[in-house]
């Protein structure tokens, strides 16, 4: 479960969270102890990940979600951690989409610049973007930061959507997540 952070909170170091729900972080992201990768503006955290706003006025609500534990490649992440991370991405993606009323939220997991496993969540607004078919990295508009009051509003809006999702989830009994059936490597078909 994701726990939101209010924009007016004092940030202090967290105590470990026993569950996998995104929650309100009570800290500034001190970064990975191994590589130093950190988020700009923390929004929410779970036992697996931390969500933060990437300050880019071209894509209001653009965020990064990073694994708390250091892994350099997605294929090295244990299944339980990866499942929790993907669940957090899904919750964050839905919250951002609803908060900023985006047509969609692109998810990109690259690892070319930062070796720490993380995902970019980029709200897209094709009806108002000059280049809706191009990736955010190729967007020709000048990258500028959001005004501080807009950042605080986004934190609050995303948190409100995370809270709504959490209430819905707690009122319905979720189906247990089962690991995928083991497949012998000889059964895998490569394209």
Regions found by a protein language model. Give the residues of each.
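HIT superfamily nucleotide-processing domains
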Residues: 2-191
